[in-house]
Regions:
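N-terminal "first-domain core" detector
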Residues: 1-58
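DNA polymerase sliding clamps and clamp-related checkpoint/processivity subunits
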Residues: 45-73, 132-133
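Acidic, proline/glycine-rich low-complexity IDRs
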Residues: 108-147
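Exposed alpha-helical structural elements
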Residues: 14, 83-86, 134
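Amphipathic protein-protein interaction modules
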Residues: 73-123
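Alpha-helix boundary/N-cap detector
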Residues: 2-11, 71, 75-82, 130
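Low-complexity, flexible helical/coil segments
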Residues: 65-72, 82, 137-143
Length: 147
């Protein structure tokens, strides 16, 4: 692998690590949606014990003794945005086009990462497109597939 690919993978691994840390490594899968377009955004949801779960509801699916502090959500998202910006820095350092959207799915059981990237710049082109709505759309798609 090239240095660029190594560094790019490091940033993605950092995103996954951050997401795992939030749930104390208790998720089966992590779904990360990141944007680096006319805005920066980072959001995620989980699969825990076969349930597709928003980050603020993870305690509903974790054992009581291992509940997490959901007040850390804003810190989680801020750190995620830092990783998105790091990804941009890596792409600029190697003079590579950066993805404007990323969909990452980490399977903790298999220790595998599936990724999909878009380079379209949809948010730059469409002022009515909202990250929250696109994130919710993906959440619902995954939830329907999982049933």
């Amino acid at each position: 692998m090239t240095q660029f690919e190594d560094k790019f993978m490091e940033v993605q691994a950092s995103m996954v690590s951050l997401a795992l840390e939030y749930v104390q490594n208790q998720a089966d899968k992590i779904f990360i949606y990141a944007i680096a377009d006319s805005l920066y955004s980072f959001n995620l949801f989980y699969e825990i014990k076969g349930n597709i779960v928003h980050k603020h509801l993870v305690n509903d699916f974790l054992p009581t003794k291992s509940h997490i502090d959901t007040s850390l959500q804003s810190l989680l998202l801020k750190e995620g945005v830092k990783d998105v910006k790091s990804m941009l820095d890596v792409c600029q350092e190697y003079n590579r086009e950066h993805p404007t959207e990323m969909w990452l799915i980490y399977d903790a059981k298999k220790n595998s990462l599936d990724s999909r990237y878009s380079y379209e710049g949809r948010y730059d082109k469409d002022e009515e497109l909202l990250p929250r709505l696109e994130f919710e759309k993906w959440f619902e798609e995954v939830k329907e597939q999982d049933l």
